[in-house]
């Protein structure tokens, strides 16, 4: 997928910390992405699902529904958009769950801005090769 095509995609961001959600939106929009934000997994499920060519940026630890539960529900609804997991809780358990959920990109808080864009682009290229 060429850079121009990647930029036309919508990035669905699910994060329950409002300050982080605003920061992620700003960061992605500054890079030219279309962005939709959701404060929880249930909000995303109720308001709109990603389509082909879109990407998800999902927080791992959320109050109502954790990121992995959201990913499982989306996969159950045949949503195949690539996922970039954001977490402040790295470790072997998270890595194992990510791998079993098909998540290949993990971004660590609080260093999101250092690598988020690169991970989003890589996830989308892997999901939609040119």
Please describe what each predicted stretch is.
Residues 18-36:
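Two-component/phosphorelay signaling modules centered on CheY-like receiver
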Residues 37-55:
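Acidic, metal-coordinating helix/loop segments flanking the phosphotransfer/catalytic sites
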Residues 58-59:
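Active-site T/S-Asp motif of two-component receiver
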Residues 62:
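Receiver (REC) domain active-site loop signature in two-component systems and cognate sites
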Residues 109-110:
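A Lys-centered signature of the CheY-like receiver
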């Amino acid at each position: 997928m060429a850079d121009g095509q990647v930029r036309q995609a919508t990035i669905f961001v699910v994060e329950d910390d409002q300050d982080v959600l605003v920061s992620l939106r700003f960061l992605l929009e500054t890079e030219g992405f279309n962005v939709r934000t959701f404060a929880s997994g249930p909000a995303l499920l109720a308001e709109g699902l990603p389509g082909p060519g879109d990407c998800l940026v999902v927080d791992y630890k959320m109050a109502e529904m954790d990121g992995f539960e959201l990913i499982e529900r989306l996969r159950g609804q045949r949503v195949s958009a690539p996922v970039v997991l954001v977490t402040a809780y790295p470790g072997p358990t998270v890595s194992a769950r990510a791998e079993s959920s098909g998540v290949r990109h993990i971004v660590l808080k609080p260093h999101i801005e250092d690598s988020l864009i690169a991970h989003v682009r890589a996830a989308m290229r892997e999901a939609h090769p040119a």
